[in-house]
Amino acid sequence: MDNKQYNALFSFIWNIANDVLVHAFEKGDYKKIILPFMVLRRIDVLLESTKAAVLEKKEFCDSHHLADYTPFLTQVTGYPFYNTSAFTMKTLKNEIDPQRLKMNIIEYFNGFSQDVQDIIDKFKLRQQVDNLIEANRLGSLLEKFTDENINLSVKPVMQEVINEDGTKEMVERLPGLDNHTMGTIFEELLRKFNEENNVTEAGEHFTPRDYVRLLGQLAIEPIKDKITDNTYTIYDGACGTGGILTIVQEEIERIANEEGKRVRTSIFGQELQPDTYATCKADLMISGNINKFSYRLGSVDHQYIAFGSTISQDGHAGEKFDFCISNPPFGTPWKEDLKKWGIEDKKEITDPRFFDGVTSFIPEIGDCQMLFLANNISRMKDSPLGTRIVEVHNGSSLFTGKAGGGESNLRKYIIENDLLEAIIQMPDNDFYNTKIATYIWVVTNRKEERRKGKVQLIDASNIKTVLDKHLGKKNCYTSDKNRKEILDLLVNFQNNDNSVILDNEEFGYWDVEVLRPAKNDKGETVMVKGKVKYVKDKYSFQIPYNYEGGIERFFEKEVQQRDPEAILGKATLGYEIRFANYFSRKVDAKETKDLQVKIGSMQKEVLSLLPKLSDWFRTDNIDLKESKNPIFGKIPAHWDEIQFKYCFD
């Protein structure tokens, strides 16, 4: 599907809301109707051609008293789903009586196989039918979605044409709609509906197709020579509409095929939002990526695409995977997960993915993305190839959290166990609904020999191609050439302007408490049982882990020379990755000149004010008052005045 065809399809669906729902529904409700019916039509159109054969086979099964007719009907449809009602969306639209139309569409819903029923329930389609019937809009909506000028099927619409020589041939009239393009349309519609109503889905960012291809290539390219004829598993614990799963699957199979390997892949995912879960499940059913919906691990049945919170409702408990690729929510609170666990405090969490009995990887309640990383770490296989994790984060995962806190502990665990292969900074404005820069973490438990004990930081913030037209906030994309450049930086493993290779210890630091003698009101040192009483200072020092001479030497040199009474307190080991410290930002010459002009102008303005300010802040202009403590005598009535005065002394 080219851009012109994509834009035509998107505009048609977007305008259905304005043509059918306007004045009958609140704008905030448009997405609750348009998106589910778009997915339903995508399923419906695939079953049209086999409708008669399915009804005939169903009648055969009933006459032979076959209770489980699913295998027979899915064989007829060629998909892992079917519908046993007499209706399609095209035949439904012919009914003009609202009540009969309602009965017919409910019968149509009830005729679907169980997994489509799950999709209908997650979309709350039966409730929407009631609303549409009441507003007398259901018939018009069905008319639009069955229009001959749009195609929501994965298969192209063909038509017969007669050539100049009189021969006939079938040509494509409308292209098929693949899984990821469907996901792109779904997410762009959702974004536009939200923009129309000033709604933002905090922290939730659809991953652009060009970006996902890079994720897949980062997972497979460095180990492509180690791939064997085998089955590989791919997991996404924040799978949204399934775009990452399907694109990464394509990339792994493509690269393996280029290496002359015959591989099969199985995909696993989990999603919390009902609408995106339903869309993901529908598209994986349609595209043939999933031929059955559940698998057994031990004695427990699991859904390949699980519904619920990955954090507190693990849909793949105990399962390990070959590739874990995710783009989890950024800065999204996870307090609701405490309720699902039935606890009130995060200290009560005992899930072994996040707490090993000694060390906690549990972050602050305001941001869940590190929990997704810990979840993926727990999925790593102890196999010759191990597991490769490629996960997208914002900048906060690099450094937030104090030493000894959950975020720092997780970084410490990853780095000390030599799991961190690389972190790649991507360009700003690379996503549809956020301008922030993103960072790709590449984690593996099978590092190649040259990488052991090392971490590679890659600055790809300027490796991008500018878009002719912005898509939301997205103004650039990662082209094939850009992807190759980034992959070359990773695979070549060299120090240069865009790549820095560091020892693991570089990221460690000691957070050291400072203790000072307690003083009484007279300024005298407090003694307890003949010993000096020490109290913790409100400030602590961060000492590089690899500081020459260690903590004691740093403390002696940097603290005790200025404060001989201070002594060392508790030292806690933390880890952080100050990415910007290792790359210099190139500043444009014009930008520098403009900045110099602005600074010069500000200097002149400040200098013109100084005589007035310094005169006003003479000591005799400051009000003094008697201190309640006789030690101090007279003190300024307003401390901010005396502090500001010293700026001009």
Positions of predicted regions on the chain:
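A conserved structural/catalytic subdomain of Rossmann-like adenosyl-cofactor enzymes
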Residues: 4, 312-614, 618
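Hydrophobic C-terminal alpha-helix "anchor/cap" residues
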Residues: 145, 215, 413-414, 648
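Structured loop/turn residues at beta-strand edges in well-structured enzyme cores
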Residues: 28, 180, 232, 262, ...
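Positions in alpha-helical segments
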Residues: 15, 232, 265-267, 626-630
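Non-catalytic, mostly N-terminal accessory regions of nucleic-acid modification and defense proteins
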Residues: 1-223, 292-297, 302, 310, ...
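Conserved S-adenosyl-L-methionine
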Residues: 204-326, 331-336, 340-344, 394-396, ...
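Hydrophobic/aromatic-lined pockets within catalytic cores
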Residues: 21, 38-44, 48, 190, ...
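Amphipathic alpha-helical segments that form coiled-coils or helix-hairpins used
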Residues: 611-649
